[in-house]
Curated annotation (Swiss-Prot):
Similarity field: Belongs to the NADP-dependent oxidoreductase L4BD family.
Protein name per UniProt: Putative NADP-dependent oxidoreductase YfmJ
Keyword match Oxidoreductase: yes
Organism: Bacillus subtilis (strain 168)
Function: Putative quinone oxidoreductase that may contribute to the degradation of aromatic compounds.
Gene: yfmJ
Binding residues annotated for NADP(+), in chain numbering: 156-159, 182, 198, 222, 244-250, 277-279, 327
Domain of life of the native organism: Bacteria
Name of one Pfam family that matches: ADH_zinc_N
Keywords assigned by UniProt, alphabetized: Aromatic hydrocarbons catabolism, Detoxification, NADP, Oxidoreductase
EC number annotated for this UniProt entry: 1.-.-.-
Keyword Transmembrane helix: no
Induction: induced by stress due to exposure to 2-methylhydroquinone (2-MHQ).
Length: 339
């Protein structure tokens, strides 16, 4: 094993859309595991839109990344040194630094079963991504058979799972995405009833009206911004709006840039519920969600797409691509193969 490795640090806080200069590659020693720790080798790294918020030094639901320190997130890794409970060769998942090797407490890692699904799936549909879709839609959205569910960011990892769960529940599903390829994916592969390319639609409001002639009962909001403003005009009485993300405004340079139409009057008139949520709120029910997702996956009711970028050095590029809509499904970076 080499004595040194690469680590990716936050070099500066982004102004608007992140750029390569916001990241720094550092050569650091491979750590020696202490008592209760194991050494793990990074196999896959997950990059997610929420990480953009952590790059700012502002109060949020999770601590910001520190300047000149490693960024971190969901990682699939291989144990390369025996511990008390984990053994060399075990494949594990954890929230780890963006580096090639890490010394980690065994309690911070969870062994995964790669006989049920490929390791990468545990960062996507069987991980936080799938659980976000599951709890956000079913606990807040509560779709009923025959209702119309609209999903923005529908070809992304969360959105595509939301739409499929809504179909399982008997809803009519309309997805919003940003390319013809993604529209075909939603309609042909995932069986969405309608899909709208917001980048080519002449009038997003009219396109939504045509796709939702009976109005909108559930809107799973992944993007915020003008797309969400248009959906709000079509809410039915007692509509439910789980607010999962606001990727359209993550790169706003000030709060003023994030200002849009006021929705209070629409919520009052339709007696609708709009609720933000964080998947960690449901941590005591993760086993419930994971079990159901695995059953649906095994039964062929859920399908998932991954965009896998090769190479540790390409982690920043993969992250930046999230904000350009370059990924279809879950964006991952493959760093290495198991031994």
């Amino acid at each position: 094993m080499t004595a040194s490795q690469q680590q990716i640090q936050l070099a500066r806080r982004p102004q608007g859309i992140p750029v390569h200069e916001d990241f720094r590659f550092e050569t650091i020693p491979v750590p020696e595991p202490k008592q209760g720790e194991v050494l793990v080798k990074t196999l896959y790294v997950s990059v997610d839109p929420y990480m953009r918020g952590r790059m700012q030094d502002t109060k949020s639901y999770v601590e910001p990344f520190a300047l000149d320190k490693a960024l971190s997130g969901g990682v699939i890794a291989e144990v390369v040194s025996d511990g008390n409970h984990l053994k060399k060769g075990d494949i594990v998942i954890g929230n780890l630094s963006w580096q090639e090797f890490s010394a980690v407490s065994e309690s911070a890692l969870r062994k995964i079963d790669t006989s049920l699904a490929p390791a990468s799936a545990y960062l996507g549909i069987l991980g936080m991504t799938g659980l976000t879709a599951y709890f956000g839609l079913l606990d807040i959205g509560r779709p009923k058979e025959g209702e119309t569910v609209v999903v923005s960011g529908a070809a992304g990892a969360v959105g595509s799972t939301v739409g499929q769960i809504a179909k399982i529940k008997g809803a009519r599903v309309v997805g919003i995405a940003g390319s013809d390829e993604k529209i075909d994916y939603l309609k042909q592969e995932l069986q969405f009833d309608e899909a709208i390319n917001y980048k080519t639609a002449d009038d997003i409001q009219k396109a939504l009206q045509n796709a939702c002639p009976d109005g909108v009962d559930v809107y799973f909001d992944n993007v915020g911004g003008p797309i969400s403003d248009a959906v709000m005009n079509l809410l039915n009485e007692f509509a439910r709006i789980p607010v999962c993300g606001a990727i359209s405004s993550y790169n706003a340079e000030s709060e003023a840039d994030d200002m849009g139409p006021r929705v209070q009057s629409k919520l009052i008139k339709t007696k609708s519920l709009m609720q933000g949520f964080i998947v960690s709120d449901y941590s005591d029910r993760f086993s419930e969600g994971a079990k159901q997702l695995a059953e649906w996956l095994k039964a062929g009711k859920l399908h998932y797409e991954e965009t896998i970028t090769e190479g540790f050095e390409n982690i920043p590029d993969a992250f930046l691509g999230l904000f350009k809509g370059e990924n279809k499904g879950k964006q991952l970076i493959k760093v290495s193969d198991p031994s």
